[in-house]
UniProtKB/Swiss-Prot annotation:
SUPFAM superfamilies: Class II aaRS ABD-related, Class II aaRS and biotin synthetases, ThrRS/AlaRS common domain. This is Threonine--tRNA ligase. Homodimer. Its cofactor is Zn(2+). GO terms for cellular component: cytosol. The keyword Metal-binding applies. PROSITE patterns: AA_TRNA_LIGASE_II (PS50862).
Length: 602
């Protein structure tokens, strides 16, 4: 079965095997390749829908797309479906797969489809979103549904799948519309890959940053405050502060100038930038003195005004501004997810104003910055360049110069990268930085975006060597993306065992009895002078309980202090990795933690 063809590839378009007449196209085999999994998972979504329709005849279906690592389907039923119902749905799916049902495709006009599904309000919603013309329908047995495809030719290919969870989802993501049931699932071409993925899911549940955020007292959310608005608790605020201070120093060493723009700007500024026309639905607006103001969703306009605050010469360039900018974006409640998707967040944002000839040099500097930071946190990463789309501003020559500079910078660093042809923004090419965590999940974090648009809109200029006015190029640059999202990713990546240099509490100090508390607090004070946070466990509890409490907080180091340690001015050190205790003099311990802290400087 591994060598059976399930679809074909025409450039970047996947086509069903039953639709292909030109066999010169690239074949897609039944395996775990990216293209094959897209077909398998798309088909499995329909298999799930067919099973649901069989078990719940009143079911109506909205959309069922392929997503990263799986698929989902949104639908409505009279019955309440919970996690316990997934077993019987899976059982029915297996029956349908074993029945080896042929899957076929036919086309009708949009008007015919509207008539065909006239009694199905969800299908009417789908058709409203489809342009006029022919629409395709996929049929397997008695079940059929609107779909662009592609699909496998027979349900026999759909053997290795798992339904993973049930959730609610507003119709079309609009919280003002009805709530639908959403079931998520995944599928693979072989049993081993499915088994490996399910093991990762189980581990991911243990590492879920929302769960660890509560257990480690990092952050919380509160309905009275509002959705998507994280509240940082003491441990989380310390973690974040350490990350901010570390990055501040690195930025300064790399020649960035700290700046700060207001969080509230007149709507006129957003009209000039284009956000008012193109991004208004994602922004928050208010009236002040009968004038409209918008809360910033991005920091770029403030940095542009910093640039415009002085006359600029080619000798001044590049100018590198950075800010920990608090931004607000109107996210629908249905997509909010812990720290990964919030309405208020802080970007590690920088903007570099330079000449076109300086793009490569600046990108090289950013790539070195990225590499050092990712290695520090033990992330692997990959890059992708997005090139000029059909609709773009700026002449071909400057696009070519910018795109070539991005490619040459990546080549010079010896970095592998993908190319998303035509995937760039209309105002310039970009590099996306995608990190891979300990569970082999990929996360979009940083971006290096070349921008010809805003310098033009705000009429930015500098005087060149010939005393002529020229327009600079603007590079938008974020490495973490946002502190909130990065901390969420980092929490799951290290399962809450944060590196020593940013751990909210790096050292737990456990005095055995009351007579040892004074020495414990002396050590705590000495550590604080080194910018190392520690906690003294001085409650009147047993030694074993104190140690258990410290271990549950996933502290990098635990010190146990008794009569012997006080007398010798030493410590009994328990390392969370080694899980064994060793004795050090206080001076040796202080030297050790200084070495640990020195790891962050590069």
């Amino acid at each position: 079965m591994e060598k059976e063809v399930i679809a074909y590839l025409d450039n970047e378009t996947i086509i069903d095997s039953q639709s292909v007449k030109n066999t010169n196209l690239k074949e897609i085999y039944f395996d775990n390749s990216k293209e094959s999994l897209e077909v398998i998972r798309h088909s499995c979504a329909h298999l799930m829908a067919q099973a649901i329709k069989s078990l719940y005849p009143e079911a109506k279906f909205f959309v069922g797309p392929v997503i990263e690592d799986g698929f989902y389907y949104d639908f409505c039923v009279e019955s309440k479906i919970g996690e316990e119902d997934l077993v019987k749905i899976e059982k029915k799916m297996k029956e349908l797969a074993e029945a080896k049902i042929e899957i076929s495709k036919y086309k009708i006009t949009k008007n015919e489809a509207l008539a065909k599904f006239q009694n199905d309000d969800l299908k009417q919603e789908v058709l409203l979103r489809i342009p006029d013309g022919a629409v395709s329908i996929y049929k397997q047995g008695e079940f059929e549904d609107l779909c662009r495809g592609p699909h496998v030719p027979n349900t026999k290919f759909l053997r290795f799948f798992k339904l993973t969870r049930v959730a609610g989802a507003y119709l079309g993501g609009d919280e003002k519309r009805e709530m639908l049931t959403r079931i998520y699932g995944t599928a693979f071409a072989d049993k081993e890959s499915l088994k490996e993925y399910l093991a990762i899911i189980e581990e991911a549940k243990k590492r879920d940053h929302r769960k660890l955020g509560i257990e480690l007292k990092l952050f919380t959310f509160n309905d009275e405050i509002g959705g998507g608005l994280p509240i940082w608790l003491g441990n989380g605020a310390r973690l974040r502060s350490k990350l901010e201070h570390m990055l501040y120093k690195i930025h300064r060493l790399r020649g960035y100038e700290p700046v700060r723009g207001p969080e509230l700007l007149k709507a006129d500024a957003w009209k000039i930038s284009g956000h008012y026309a193109n991004y208004k639905e994602n922004m928050y607006f208010t009236q002040i003195d009968e004038q409209e103001y918008g809360i910033k969703p991005m920091n770029c306009v403030g940095h542009i005004k910093v640039y415009q605050s002085d006359v600029r010469s080619y000798r001044d360039l590049p100018l590198k501004f950075f800010e920990y900018g608090v931004v607000h974006r109107h996210e629908k409640s249905g997509v909010l997810h812990g720290l990964f998707r919030v309405r208020e967040f802080t970007q590690d944002d920088a903007h570099i104003f330079c000449m076109p000839s300086q793009i490569k040099e600046q990108v090289l500097e950013i790539l070195a910055f990225v590499d050092n930071l990712m290695k520090l946190f033990d992330f692997s990463y990959e890059m992708e360049i997005s090139t000029k789309p059909e609709k773009a501003i700026g002449d071909d020559e400057i696009w070519e110069v910018a795109t070539k500079a991005l490619k040459e910078a990546l080549d010079e660093q010896g970095l592998k990268y993908g190319i998303d042809e035509g995937g760039g923004a209309f105002y310039g090419p970009k590099i996306d930085i995608k990190i891979t965590d300990a569970l082999k999940r990929k996360w979009q974090c940083g971006t290096i975006q070349v921008d010809f648009n805003l310098p033009s809109r705000f009429k930015l200029e500098y005087t060149d060597s010939d005393n002529e006015k020229k327009q600079p190029v603007m590079l938008h640059r974020a490495i973490l993306g946002s502190f909130e999202r990065f901390i969420g990713i980092l929490t799951e990546h290290c399962a809450g065992e944060f590196p020593f240099f940013i751990a909210p509490t790096a050292v737990g100090i456990v005095p055995i009895g009351e007579a040892h508390i004074a020495y414990a607090k002396e050590i705590q004070k000495e550590l604080l002078e080194l910018n190392i946070d520690s906690e003294v466990y001085e409650k009147n509890e047993s030694l074993s309980k104190k140690i258990r409490i410290a271990e549950k907080q996933k502290l990098p180091m635990i010190l146990v202090l008794g009569d012997d340690e006080v007398a010798k001015r030493s410590v009994a050190l328990r390392d969370r990795r080694a899980k064994e205790q060793k004795n050090l003099s206080l001076d040796e311990f202080i030297k050790l933690v200084k070495e640990k802290m020195s790891e962050v400087y590069f």
